[in-house]
Amino acid sequence: MWNIAVAESLTTQHVAELKRLYLDGTKHSCYQNVPRFMSRHIDLSEKLQPLWRDDVPRLDLVREYFDFSHLASVVDVGANTGYFSLSLAFDHPNLEVTAIEGHAGHADFIAEVADLAGLGNIKVVNQYVDQQTDPRLLDSEVVLHFNVLHHQGVDNPDNIDSTDRFFPVAAQALSRAHQEGRRLVLQMGFNWGGDKKQPIVALDDDLGKLRYLERLVEAARFEIRDLALPVLNEGGDRYRYVIYPFEHIRRD
């Protein structure tokens, strides 16, 4: 559990500041779930639509795929308000976690929670990852790259003017994470900058998305080993990820 002394030290000012940072009204505020260890003590959770945006299944996925108790380091690219990085740092005190987030308010939120929870194993870097990023910033065994790549050229200084120029910029940005033996967990949106009027691949073209993703990953010098696909529960209100070898997907 969260350190009792930490919980007792939460003042009204602490709560107000956390709410201000989490609910700041910017493009990606209230975007992630709040880490469970914190939500027990502070009610910041917004009503997130679990069929559209839910971080719990993705965290369950990476926990199923990796044994973090035997890993030394992980980097969370585009960490937002830190659901993944804070949760992993809290659950695995020996794991060195780096949360990279370009929005200053979100980065401050992660740092504030980490400080209050006494998490000395997490480093917060207020920076966007793009094609100019120093690869040493991403030095780790595992890189989490969840749903941020499609913002290349929109939410960072690359400033490209069309989806036609997106591919080489995104591939170069993703390649900054490449290192022999490093594992990358990649999820990519297909609306450029989150704009439904500017699809990178048509919404209903699932095969096209898969082919695009394969080309992009190869251009970044990675190789897809497995693919995780969402499966709805019997009630149809939540989903989980099921992992398939990528070669089976390609063959079928």
Q: PLM features: residue spans?
A:
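Conserved alpha-helix/loop element of class I SAM-dependent methyltransferases that forms part
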Residues: L51-H70
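Conserved class I S-adenosyl-L-methionine
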Residues: H70-N80
